[in-house]
């Protein structure tokens, strides 16, 4: 049975960069966001439900209208919950199939919503990537030309979890404010994980 490692963090924190380091170190990575987008375009049941919810403009020539969906779900909490209820169960099943198809000693799951979707319960180890908000905003503005600062702050708010009870504790935290190299940090965590497997 594989040792499942979750890599999480808010938008712009650098979790994909950390996941890419794992990939280049030879580990298989399941990117929840990429797979969700793929399934939102290819799974006919999801396409039908999202079209019913948002209308024909949710898709352009078979491709997801990311700008419309992003603007819609981050401004309307109830709509975001409806979309998540459509997409998350399919993505979770897709992840389980991926795990079964890849019986490696260590597998990586990247997801911004590890705690929000309760998928943390099936992971053996969680790495949280964090960065200061102003740095995250700059990164996202440089990467996503269709977003503005207001949109980004809305997304950040939607990804925030209520941790008043202190139940959500990652095993490792990687600070990613651009001051230190990430590779040595990830390698150090890999060595610790390998000692547990």
Stretch-by-stretch model annotation:
Residues 16:
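Walker A/P-loop
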Residues 13:
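ATP-binding Walker
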């Amino acid at each position: 049975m594989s040792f499942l490692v979750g890599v999480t963090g808010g938008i712009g924190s650098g979790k994909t960069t950390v996941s890419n380091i794992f990939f280049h170190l030879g580990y298989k990575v399941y990117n929840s966001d990429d797979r969700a987008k793929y399934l939102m375009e290819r799974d006919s049941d999801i396409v039908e439900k999202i079209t019913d919810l948002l209308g024909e403009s949710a898709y352009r020539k078979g491709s997801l209208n990311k700008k419309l969906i992003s603007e819609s779900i981050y401004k309307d909490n109830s709509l975001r919950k409806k979309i998540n209820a459509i997409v998350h169960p399919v993505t979770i099943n897709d992840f389980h199939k991926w795990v079964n198809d890849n019986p490696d000693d260590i597998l990586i799951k990247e997801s911004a919503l590890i705690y929000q979707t309760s998928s943390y319960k099936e992971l053996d180890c969680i790495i949280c990537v964090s960065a200061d908000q102003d740095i995250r905003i700059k990164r996202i503005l440089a990467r996503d030309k269709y977003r503005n600062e207001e949109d980004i702050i809305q997304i950040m708010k939607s990804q925030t979890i209520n941790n008043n009870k202190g139940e959500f504790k990652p095993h490792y935290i990687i600070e990613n404010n651009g001051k230190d190299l990430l590779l040595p940090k990830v390698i150090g965590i890999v060595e610790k994980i390998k000692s547990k497997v």
